[in-house]
């Protein structure tokens, strides 16, 4: 059958002589599971084959095997079920297209597919080859083809293709990523041809240097399937992005600072081969990426560039301006100048100086105001312009000063200053001194009577009585043994090259001289001695006369007048006269003795004068303050904290025109015209001078407030009254608020000036006053009495019964009325008494007493007739009233036994008596203070032991059974006495200027106790003595005695009043006591001029003590708790901010504890400084930016913050002082820019600025910044302000990565190369913004483990075993040997079980093992493990093959010790006969010997160093490792060098150095006080002392050299082997000696110069003389020669 089929097929093929039957399809087609694929297919058949019924298309799967039908166009039922619905014939059979589409591919669809088409039974064809289909689950990576040559500027195509293609899939893509979209174009091509099926994307790029290092990624995606492939571009290019980085960016570069310039290249391929540096276009000849200036100088300023070169080319960076921040002063013209010339000083700065420099000029360290330009012009200079000038340049980063330049102005001598003195201390001596001011120095000549006596040029009168000394521009003549001829006129002449001047003075030889010791100006209490000296010869009867203020004070034989304690009365003009026999000296010149004393308590009065002339207001206030002091005190008058007037003349623009101030010495008179309310109050007069201060206060009442009652002060009840408060004030208070007082008590407050009483009631009658409420308070008006008239009210009539001494009744009638009422008392119709005639009754049983509106009637020996109706009538001009009562006489009374006066605890019996006797059945009731006593119903009340609470009024009531009326007894009072109890003693001190102490002792006692007050066992006050008697004992004490109370007032308490007071209370029954401590506050600190001062002012702090023992006081000061030297006062010549602290002084009396004052805080005001402007950004949500400006200022500065030219914030009263805070909510790019902060205060201002960068761009990593290797990571650039057209540039570890519209980087498979720092830049129309770098950490398991070992053979065999590994995170490492753990990284402090020392580092473990036994079994295992995996490695220690050096006794030996170094062979074997050993010291060859030992007997310090040996053995030469030999020795004598600042001696340096091994401990002592040490914890710290301690050296810099820092300093050096010390004097004494030595050198130089000039003149004169003689000899010789020649010529002619 097959043979027949083949024959028929051949016949059909060759029937027409051509091959037209065939099928074309790809050999291979690939697809992905779940996707689809298309097998392109075309077929052909001969043209002459008829097609009548169409063509049947059949696709088979595995035709040679299973032969499953995939497609059957004739009978679809024949299709295998697994292909039904998934296979589709896509071709048109009429067009001979037979494409097969397979959908929903599965892996089992892989295999061979064959196409068969049938036209008829005899015309059919089968594609035997078929198409192989491969279906996989994951796609294979795309195929990338790249050009061979890549270079910058070329355009190249990069092709990426994949065999997977399915047109029916919509989610299929083949894309290039990582390219720059602005310089590249992509195109795509799909091939569905019988020749092949593939999908290709072409990337066309214009290459640039930025493409170097770019990773191109081609990614294929089909539904959920994807694959990718990367290619790394290497584009050769010249260096790009060359720039210079400055190490000192952001601050000033000062002279001497190290500066590093780094040439950074952004990109270069190949690598940079050369870097050249240039400054200002001139090649510096320096190569390398880094240019280091170890010490910046003037010439280092300039514009720097660097040029980077590789094989592709070179690039020069942009110039970087380097400015060395320094200044130099240049002068035009240079050198000394003459007066009236113009001088210009230029403050020159190096090149590349910034434009915003600010200049300041200083002369002699004093700032010149209004000199802020780079040049300083001095037109028409004078001698006052001579001095040292320097300039200061300043910018935002700091300031720097130039070196000083000396400006010398030359001028002729001024008028000389000629003075004369008489010295009679050791013989009569006259001194004449002449000094002059000139430039250059002048020649000074002193003459008398036309005769030159002395000159500073050396032309002197060599008189043995004369002693001459001179200095520059100064001449001093001392004349001994004065004679009358020495009197007369003396003349001083001064001459220099520019002119001369003279002055004259009369000198008298025989004149007395008055000397005052210690000075003509002393402080009160100081001892003063006045001495009288004259030229008279001493005689036995020499007399001295003393005169004070022209009047004879004393006459006697003593030449001295002693004032043991000078007082103000001793001040005056003194002179003396001497008389010796018949000779009398002239009077001495008057000398004024001035005695200084602090201000006494001022006399201060304040009064109001009323002008009775009737012209004008007629009111004026007079304030007069007078004080006694010398020097005159500065007076200040203060009112409500404000200065009203001072004794210093000043213009007060804010003072009232009504105030007139008159000033005299120590007196201040202030007159206030028409005083108003604001002028009232307490005025304080302060007086202060350099020795102390005092004050006094006075109250001034201007009567500016007047109360007026209308219509009258006396009104009838029910009428209307208006009370008006009239206030005379300068500025009306709006709204006004008034306080009204009634009978001295606050009545009402409000804004009404008038209070209306409508209607007026009797209760309104009172004393009224008012005042205006102000902040400082105001005086009350004068009180006004309001009287209210009304008729009498019904009188109050009462009757009292007293039977204590017999029956007595008292009738009292009182009434309320005004005016006073006429009172009459009646019994029935019988008039008993009136207040007009109170003694009207004539009998003595009835007595009447009358007071205002009160009438009292006493009726004694009451009888039944006194019972009846009593009534009282009251009458005045406005009306009358009456009242009545019925009085019945009752017969009971109370009898007390033993007495109503009782002692506490005593028994008492009270009996109820009735006059008619006791009836049977009478009942009794007892009452205490009106309260019934239930426990007693008998006629007797017994109290066994009476107490205080049982004292009071007792009465009884007797009720007879046969009567209805009870008999009520009058009350009887029981008084109970008791011992003193509850003694209290309180001690108070008022703080007003009067200083008043109060001691109050009170007690509960009956009878009143006798009180005694003791102080230190001394009776101070007592109730036994009268107040006058006690006050007379001490005028400062005032005693007030009240019942059971004793008050002691101490006026101006003194130090001796301090202490414990005891109060003792006693009466006849007992005693008690109490104690209290009294603080007199007699020690007080006063601050002059004020406790609030400006920085730089002089401040005096004085310890004021109120004490009667001023001479025996000792003082101690405390500054901020630190004790200072003791003195009554301390002076701060120039107060600093550091001085702003609390001060207190302590005063001690002999034998008593010191008394401390209350602290006083010194407030130092200064201009704003340390202005700082910073900003903070919220890192999470970026919703807030905080701009913070702070400054150091006192008083607090007014801060303003500006953005550009717009003010954005300023400080207010509610702000934190010296702080300004600006919060920017949701900041935008418009908020970025330059912010300026200014600080203003009354003392100055400061400014600073800052560039605000919001940093709104940030890099975010997903899923996190730390991922395991191989995991995908997406790096996103987030910028909330980015526009849609923004471009994103990415940088990795500072290198450009890519740029494009994509805001994210995707790493599908991360590797270690992806780790590092990423940051991005966003470019849009708003500008360019950069993010901060974000770190990406790639985690991976440990790898590349290395276990190594090496030996350290110094003195013993030591092996170091080290294991390292590469891992992230760091691995935990374990080192083991034979299964035993020797070391572990997580036990870094272990000692390896005593085996050796362990060192742990990141991914490294190091073990030092001593005395390792070499040989087998030395296998070590290192294991490293982290969370991602572990790794281990092994290492066997090698056997020892090298020689080593051993030392005996060791390598650290003391100097002088014997030492042997041995060259030890491997294994400890000895040397053979042909061996030799060579020793080396510090790499220098010493010697060779056959023995391996190098001996030192003994070793010295110079032999310390590195030693190693070389052994020449028969087997070859080998060299040991070097060992270090240390020779130990004690310190040598230290070198102590002292440096003192030559200008003013304010700074100094002590430098101590020593040689020792081991290093020495250095200490520096002044006396017994430790000043510094190189052991930091030993030395005390002081702010003005800076200590530096390099090895074996100690340096101490003292910035403020004071007396406490001067003295002998000792530097001591010690180590374990010994110690040594050296000393030197440190202070200004050395500076003074240096200055004296400099002056001596100047004089010697002058003398040497003069001598050289003189020798030169002599030599010149000798030379001239010799030259003249030689010339004459030469002329004579010439003449003789001429004559000789003439003779010879004549002889020749004759011949």
From Swiss-Prot:
**GO CC annotation:** extracellular region; plasma membrane
Q: Which residues lie on this side of the membrane: Cytoplasmic?
A: 1661-1695
The UniProt record lists the Ig-like V-type domain at: 20-136
Q: What is the reported tissue distribution? A: Detected in lymph node in the subcapsular sinus, interfollicular regions, and T and B-cell boundary (at protein level). Expressed by macrophages in various tissues. Highest expression in spleen and lymph node with lower amounts in lung, liver, bone marrow, heart and skin. No expression in thymus, kidney, brain or small intestine.
List, in alphabetical order, the Gene Ontology terms for molecular function in this entry.
Answer: carbohydrate binding
* Segments passing through the bilayer: 1640-1660
As given in the record, the signal peptide range reads 1-19
Reported phenotype of the disruption mutant: SIGLEC1-deficient mice are viable, display no gross developmental abnormalities, and exhibit only subtle changes in B- and T-cell populations. However, they are significantly more susceptible to bacterial infection than WT. In addition, serum IgM and IgG amounts are greatly reduced in mutant mice.
- Gene3D superfamilies noted in UniProt: Immunoglobulins
Spell out where the chain is glycosylated.
159, 266, 299, 340, 500, 583, 693, 722, 737, 882, 1090, 1100, 1247, 1460, 1474
Give start and end of each Ig-like C2-type domain.
153-235, 239-321, 326-406, 416-508, 509-594, 602-701, 704-781, 795-890, 894-973, 980-1079, 1081-1161, 1172-1264, 1245-1337, 1342-1439, 1442-1520, 1534-1627
Provide the binding site for N-acetylneuraminate.
Answer: 63, 116, 122-126
SMART domains on file: IG, IGc2
Q: Which residues lie on this side of the membrane: Extracellular?
A: 20-1639
Name the cystine pairs. 36-166, 41-98, 160-218, 263-306, 347-391, 434-492, 532-576, 625-685, 725-770, 813-872, 912-956, 1001-1063, 1103-1145, 1189-1237, 1277-1320, 1363-1422, 1463-1509, 1552-1611
Which Pfam families is this protein grouped with? C2-set_2 (PF08205), I-set (PF07679), ig (PF00047), Ig_2 (PF13895), V-set (PF07686)
Q: What does this protein do?
A: Macrophage-restricted adhesion molecule that mediates sialic-acid dependent binding to lymphocytes, including granulocytes, monocytes, natural killer cells, B-cells and CD8 T-cells. Plays a crucial role in limiting bacterial dissemination by engaging sialylated bacteria to promote effective phagocytosis and antigen presentation for the adaptive immune response. Mediates the uptake of various enveloped viruses via sialic acid recognition and subsequently induces the formation of intracellular compartments filled with virions (VCCs).
What protein name does the entry list?
Answer: Sialoadhesin
Protein encoded by which gene: Siglec1
